[in-house]
């Protein structure tokens, strides 16, 4: 009990400081599914989808079954609305359960289960994702709990087998990828010729998932996994996935190079990775060298795992470890071949088995030696990620809210966290064909997740100001400019890097307030031939008029709108006429 309390406190110590973390990545999609579950519990995916400007009738191709979203729906029922801190704190039950499940397995398979479990709790991948609402930790928690309960059954605990089966069902109900380690577990049971009831307890999970997918296929008229796989296999590059897999394995399992073998594997690993770097381009030599450092460390980890697995096989001992030996290569190979990218959360799924095999006989002293610097690294990465995801929420509060108070109508052309916080303020997200914005409306877009808008919208919009979102903290975890891809290797082939590159650039554009304006290469223009022309509109407060003018004329702001007055010339041209918030000019 003392050990469990210690483990729970360590997990909470990694979550509580970051519980105010802003919504980011796919969290806004999970929250949308959770809200939809209140009106369509069985099929929460049956809600209109808008993703990167593309509209679809539903989220039938959503990459996760809805069990995890049901828990979020429960939190919505309790609080009535989304709140970062209580949602993340109550979501921590999954992180605690995952560590408890790992500890139970470590007690069975390793010499120092407590310290190994502490190492797992502070590993970078687990530590960072524990404070998120992503579904990887809940899926892993149910999976590890199921394995732990199964071995409890093997030791004679009554009633543990059906509980184990229920955990497996929940795991695949949260994420399809739980089927990979579960398949390895089933293969291990078959090889050991375990009783039929044990085999059935595992088979129950894919059977339950299949039944649900059949129901979804009947309801939506499409088979969800086929849609998901059809997208993934057309997006990824196997070679880039291999490169990213090596660097991520070497950097987010434990502190780099603390898992090392003999000098020959180390030398061989560095040379092998250096050769691999010849087959792709690199933004700089420094970046390439950083990749070699991390990727060669990852290759050593995999070589060490292979050696430990071979030693385990040669020993002839079999206390149920067979599935651990299969789990790591099967999971990593799956993501390399199927994934559209590599992410730290993908490596997380293989991490328990990797630890249980590599550190099977590790001494307490060695584990302490590894745990301390790993915890420091994890804290650094968690803080860096915390800063990067919070900039969107902070920017919306500091910039968008005042614009709304001044009377501007605002639209969103954003995704992920920025989209979520704009929508929280009642701002509608535009599709690529939506022509709803009217003259004088503002549109918020950003560089990180940029997508095209309707031609008429893009042609008549004028960028008022571009904001650079950044921080002085010198570590980046998810940053295309820096090449850091902790959450997505398409951003970079290393999970983190030392850099102060800007997180994102957010632009605020305005639909030209002059309704009769037309497109030109230099921006929207209005040709005036009449002596006066009025444009009725409500002018937001605390603003000023800016424009470029070819000819002699003047613009008068009235309570009812704008009056354009032409001079003696037969025609004048107003170019980039805009209503600018005064705070933009001051900034």
Predicted regions and their residues:
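Transmembrane-helix signature of polytopic, membrane-embedded enzymes
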Residues: 2-4, 85, 102-123, 140-141, ...
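Extracytosolic helix-loop segments that constitute the early lumenal/periplasmic catalytic or substrate-binding loops
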Residues: 13, 29-60, 67-70, 74
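Short acidic/glycine- and proline-prone juxtamembrane loop motifs at membrane-interface regions
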Residues: 24, 128-138, 343
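Transmembrane-helix motifs of polytopic, lipid-linked glycan transferases
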Residues: 86-109, 145, 149
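Membrane-interface transmembrane helices that cradle and orient dolichyl/undecaprenyl
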Residues: 107-110, 146-163, 171, 193, ...
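Short helix- or helix-capping micro-motifs
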Residues: 116-124, 148, 168, 172
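Membrane-lumen/periplasm interface segments of specific transmembrane helices
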Residues: 183-287, 377-390, 394
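Membrane-embedded, lumen/periplasm-facing catalytic core of multi-pass transferases
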Residues: 368-442, 447, 483-526, 537
């Amino acid at each position: 009990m003392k050990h469990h309390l210690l483990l729970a406190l360590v997990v909470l110590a990694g979550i509580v400081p970051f519980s105010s973390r802003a919504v980011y990545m796919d969290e806004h999609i999970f929250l949308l599914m959770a809200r939809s579950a209140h009106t369509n519990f069985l099929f929460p995916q049956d809600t209109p989808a808008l993703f990167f400007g593309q509209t679809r009738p539903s989220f039938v191709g959503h990459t996760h079954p809805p069990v995890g979203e049901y828990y979020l729906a429960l939190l919505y029922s309790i609080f009535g609305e989304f709140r970062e801190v209580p949602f993340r704190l109550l979501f921590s039950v999954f992180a605690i359960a995952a560590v408890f499940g790992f500890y139970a397995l470590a007690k069975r398979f390793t010499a120092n289960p407590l310290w190994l479990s502490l190492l797992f709790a502070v590993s970078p991948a687990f530590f960072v994702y524990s404070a998120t609402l992503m579904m990887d930790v809940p899926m892993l928690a149910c999976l590890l709990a199921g394995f732990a309960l199964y071995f409890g059954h093997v030791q004679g605990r009554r009633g543990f087998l059906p509980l184990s089966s229920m955990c497996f069902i929940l795991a695949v109900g949260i994420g399809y990828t739980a089927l990979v380690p579960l398949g390895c577990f089933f293969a291990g049971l078959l090889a050991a010729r375990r009783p039929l009831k044990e085999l059935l307890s595992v088979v129950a999970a894919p059977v339950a998932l299949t039944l649900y997918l059949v129901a979804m296929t009947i309801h939506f008229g499409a088979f969800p996994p086929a849609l998901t796989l059809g997208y993934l296999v057309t997006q990824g590059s196997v070679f880039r996935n291999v490169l990213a897999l090596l660097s991520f394995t070497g950097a987010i399992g434990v502190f780099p190079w603390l898992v090392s073998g003999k000098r020959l594997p180390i030398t061989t690993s560095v040379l092998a990775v250096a050769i691999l770097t010849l087959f792709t381009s690199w933004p700089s030599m420094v970046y390439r060298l950083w990749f070699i450092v991390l990727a060669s460390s990852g290759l050593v980890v995999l070589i060490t795992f292979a050696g430990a697995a071979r030693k385990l096989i040669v020993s002839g001992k079999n206390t149920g470890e067979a599935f651990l030996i299969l789990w790591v290569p099967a999971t990593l190979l799956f993501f390399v071949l199927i994934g559209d990218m590599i992410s730290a959360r993908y490596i997380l799924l293989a991490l328990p088995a990797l630890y249980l095999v590599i550190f099977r006989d590790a001494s307490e002293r060695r584990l302490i030696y590894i745990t301390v610097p790993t915890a420091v690294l994890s804290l650094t990465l968690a803080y860096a990620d915390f800063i990067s995801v919070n900039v969107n929420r902070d920017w919306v509060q500091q910039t968008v809210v005042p614009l709304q108070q001044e009377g501007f109508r605002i639209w969103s052309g954003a995704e992920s966290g920025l989209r979520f916080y704009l929508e929280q303020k009642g701002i509608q997200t535009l599709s690529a064909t939506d022509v709803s914005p009217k003259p004088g409306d503002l549109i918020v877009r950003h560089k990180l997740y940029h997508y095209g808008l309707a031609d008429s919208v893009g042609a008549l919009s004028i960028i008022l100001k571009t904001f650079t979102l950044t921080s002085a903290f010198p570590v980046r975890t998810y940053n295309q400019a820096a090449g850091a891809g902790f959450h997505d290797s398409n951003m970079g082939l290393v999970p983190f890097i030392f850099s102060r590159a800007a997180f994102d650039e957010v632009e605020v554009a305005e639909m030209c307030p002059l309704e009769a304006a037309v497109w030109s290469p230099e921006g929207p223009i209005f040709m005036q031939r009449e002596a006066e022309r009025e444009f009725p509109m409500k002018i937001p407060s605390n603003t000023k008029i800016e424009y470029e003018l070819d000819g002699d004329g003047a613009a008068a702001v009235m309570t009812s709108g704008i009056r354009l007055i032409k001079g003696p010339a037969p025609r004048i041209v107003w170019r980039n006429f805009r209503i600018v918030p005064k705070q933009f000019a001051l900034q």
